[in-house]
Amino acid sequence: MNKIYSLVEDIYKVVATKEIPEDVDLYDEIDKFGEGCKSLMTKLFTEERNDGRKLRMSNIGRDDRYLWNAVNNSDVQEDMTPNTYVKFMYGHLIEEMLLFLTKLSGHEVTDEQKQCEVAGIVGHMDCKIDGVVTDVKSTSTFGFKKFKDGSLAFDDPFGYVAQIKGYAHSEGETKFGWLAMDKQNGHLTYLMYDSDDTQAPVHAKIGYDIEEHIERVKKLVEQPVWPEVCHEVVPDGKSGNQKLAVGCSYCQYKHVCWSGLRTFLYSSGPRYLTEVINEPKVQEVS
């Protein structure tokens, strides 16, 4: 059985050469991949969507006000747009494909969607690859860089570290990692952290006690008053206007936190302005 350190190299090799390891049954894995996609589509189109009104392992690492809103204000969150649903569906299919390629390249995949629980918070890990608790991610080119250079722990707006720390902790493990794909270019990388490695540059960001973190968050969301905003506004270039930070611009509670928010459609995408000194010369939407 191959080791996880050669995972990306082995996947690249198998797709380039079509040389399947002797101990891998190609047609069996293809059948399993097809069944996995079928199961995924069945789940997406038949199960009720989560209303977000509770703490889960997948959101436990998000910013404090986001979590407070998720528990106490979920009825005022923005509706998800159809294209966002398509984007998430596409991401799930990519993740299914990556696990297929992992198995096809001779690596062991176990514990898929295994339920985990820490301090009363429940979640389901993606899997273990070669015994390492692993999350599989499809990312933008920009997001991929953080997995490639190992800087994710320093810029983790979606709480990926806390999520996977919870899964690993429930298994009695300190090592965990992400198999990530740049969905625009097809590049792959594997990032592994070890929360017991005190010499690692990221240790100050990942070495915390996940049970203590969860208990703090559970108390926080029970408070009657919401916490401070997650991110302060930032200048919109040299216009004199102020806009939401990236972490807030993607949040479905931004209009709750920032009353009077105005949205302008730039060629690069929507820009959310909290203060307008100079009116942008682009379309505004309500």
Model regions and ranges:
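Residue-level preference for long, well-ordered alpha-helices that form the structural scaffold
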Residues: 87, 156-160, 202, 206-210
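Metal-dependent nuclease catalytic cores that hydrolyze phosphodiester bonds in DNA/RNA
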Residues: 1-133, 140-151, 158, 286
